[in-house]
Amino acid sequence: MTRTEAFWDRHNTRMTDPEQARAFAAELASIRTVDTIVNALDEHRAAAGLSKAALARAIGSDPSVVRRLLTATTNNPTLSTVAEVAAALGLKVQLVPMTDAERQELTEPMLGTTHAAETTGAA
C-alpha cells in the first residue's frame, strides 16, 4: 500500500466517527472560505491596478497587514480586516447559500453529532 493509499484509508476510517467527521468538515469549510475570500480580494486588487502597499494605505493600515493577508500560507484574517479591504476594492462581504453538494460535504457532518444528541435527548 502506498503512503497516499494509507493516508486515505486512515482518513476514511476516522470519518466514520461523527465527531471526527464534524471537526474535519468544520476545518475544511474554514480553509475553503478563507482561500476563496483571500483569492478574490487579491484578484480584485490586481485588476484595480493597486499594489499591496497602496491597498494598505487605502485602509489606513501597515503594508505588512495586507501583505500577510494576501500572501500568507497560513492565515486567519479578522472579519473587520476582510471587510475593510473589500470596501477599499469596491466590494462587500456577503454570505450565500451552499450548494446541495457543499451542504452534504460540510453542513451535514457538522450538524450530525449535534442533531443526533438533540433527537436522543442527550446534550
Annotate each language-model stretch with its function.
Residues 1-39, 104-123:
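N-terminal flexible/basic segments that precede or flank functional cores
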Residues 24, 28-36, 50, 72, ...:
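Residues at secondary-structure transition points
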Residues 39-56:
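Short basic helix-loop element that most often maps to the first helix and adjoining turn
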Residues 41, 52, 63, 79-82:
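Helix-turn-helix DNA-binding elements, focusing on the entry/boundary residues of the two helices
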Residues 60-76:
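Recognition helix of helix-turn-helix/homeodomain-like DNA-binding domains
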Residues 80-95:
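DNA major-groove recognition helix of helix-turn-helix/homeodomain DNA-binding modules
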Residues 96-106:
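Short amphipathic recognition helices of helix-turn-helix/homeodomain-type DNA-binding modules
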